[in-house]
Structure formats: structure tokens, C-alpha cells
Regions:
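Ribonuclease/tRNase effector modules and their secretory precursors
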Residues: 1-235
Length: 235
């Protein structure tokens, strides 16, 4: 083998070596992106719906004394906070921290509920009770570990775990309320038991529930998701 052939062979070996290194890099990158994509797809699978590009419905598996999995499904993404029972609410225009007591927390939650009601066109349901009372009841429905109660600020009104489970008919075998309207229905049923709703409002809720969410107490995501919101718009 002459010098030129040896040089050519060395060049080929070098190129092959470079290609192997490049292939390893690409393989590693592909593995990385494949894992990243799989992780993203898994996260996307956990986002069981969205409303107007703002409302995310993100499941959170929680262990409670009832032994159930509960799906947060409200206008914002909700995540369980620390052991103190904090609940974090993320809006499209910023991040709010909702705590279980204190005047500042009340202001935050009031702001959140005002935004919530504006987006869902539910202001009419506040005719005969304050937004603070509505806020406490609503947030109470999403607190499995303990009810959110503002007794010093809002009087003696509160909602308990038993109220929530009785209203939603959830049981220890893994049934849960997975939709915004269901959670509002829980609040609605609780308020009915406390005589907080007017008869005219009750009729509207009954109409919505009877037409839209007969099959909503089930595992997973229902195919009637869009129909639920369309039915709500007709009220």
C-alpha cells in the first residue's frame, strides 16, 4: 500500500470515526428528545381538557381518608400545596397563592372568584349571597384534606368534606366529579341544603344538570365535554 492509499484509508477511517461519533451524538439526542416527547405526551394526556385556551383541567391523584382519586377541574390549574393546606391557583395573567386564612388571602381569592365568575357568566348566581361566601364554598369543594374556612372574616359559614361527598355522590371505589359543572353542582347542592339559592336559580341549575351531566360521575374523560359547556351557554 503506497502512501497515497494509506492517506486515503486514514481519511476514510477518520470520516467513519466522525460519523460514528456524530451518530452517537444524534442517537443520544434522539433518545433525549424521544424521552422528552414521551414526557410531554404524558403531561398532555394528563391535561384532560381546556376551555378558551385558558382553562386547564389537570388531574391530581390524591390520597384521602376516603381513598379516592380526585380530579381538579376548575377555571385555572390547581395544584396541591404544602402540608399547611395551601392551594395554588395559576391564572393566565399571573400566579396567585391562596392560603387558608388571612385578609390578604381573602382578597386574592375574591379576585380569583370575580375572574372566575366573569369568564363563566355566573354573576347572576350571586344575587342573594356574597362573593366571599360563594368563594369559600367553591374552594371548599376542592380541598380534600380540610375545608377552607374563613370564620373570622366571613362568619360561621363553612363547608365540610362530608358536604362535598354527599353533594357529589363520590364514593370510596374511585368515582369522582371530573368536570367544572360538577364541582359547581356540588356547590349548588350544598347551597340548596343551606337554602342559599333562589327557586329560579335552582331551576336553571336543574336544567343544566339534567341535560348535560347525567353520565359525568365516571372514571376518565367524558365525550360530552363540549356539550356541557354548550349547554351552560344556553342558560
Amino acid at each position: 500500500m503506497n502512501t497515497e492509499d494509506r492517506k486515503q484509508q486514514d481519511r476514510v477511517a477518520f470520516i467513519l470515526s466522525e460519523f460514528k461519533q456524530l451518530k452517537n451524538i444524534l442517537d443520544n439526542k434522539m433518545d433525549y428528545y424521544a424521552r422528552k416527547l414521551a414526557s410531554r405526551q404524558e403531561r398532555q394526556r394528563s391535561l384532560v381538557g381546556e376551555y378558551n385556551g385558558v382553562c386547564y383541567f389537570k388531574p391530581r391523584k390524591l390520597t384521602s381518608k376516603y381513598g379516592v382519586d380526585f380530579f381538579y377541574s376548575v377555571i385555572c390549574q390547581l395544584e396541591k400545596g404544602d402540608a399547611l393546606g395551601q392551594v395554588y391557583v395559576e391564572l393566565d395573567d399571573g400566579f396567585l397563592e391562596i392560603k387558608n386564612d388571612g385578609a390578604e388571602s381573602v382578597l386574592y381569592t375574591k379576585h380569583f372568584m370575580q375572574r372566575f365568575l366573569e369568564r363563566m357568566n355566573l354573576q347572576s348566581y350571586l344575587e342573594d349571597f356574597s362573593i366571599e361566601r360563594f368563594m369559600v364554598a367553591f374552594l371548599g369543594t376542592i380541598s380534600l384534606y380540610k375545608p377552607i374556612v374563613f370564620e373570622k372574616k366571613l362568619g360561621d359559614f363553612s363547608i365540610t368534606h362530608k358536604d362535598w361527598y354527599d353533594a357529589c355522590a363520590c364514593n370510596s371505589e374511585g368515582m369522582y366529579c371530573i368536570r367544572y359543572v360538577n364541582e359547581m353542582y356540588c356547590v349548588y347542592k350544598t347551597f340548596i341544603s343551606k337554602n342559599e339559592f333562589k327557586p329560579s336559580q335552582m331551576k336553571k341549575w336543574e336544567k343544566l344538570m339534567s341535560e348535560s351531566v347525567q353520565d359525568e360521575f365516571q372514571e376518565g374523560m367524558s365525550t360530552s365535554y363540549n356539550q356541557v359547556f354548550e349547554a351552560r351557554k344556553t342558560l
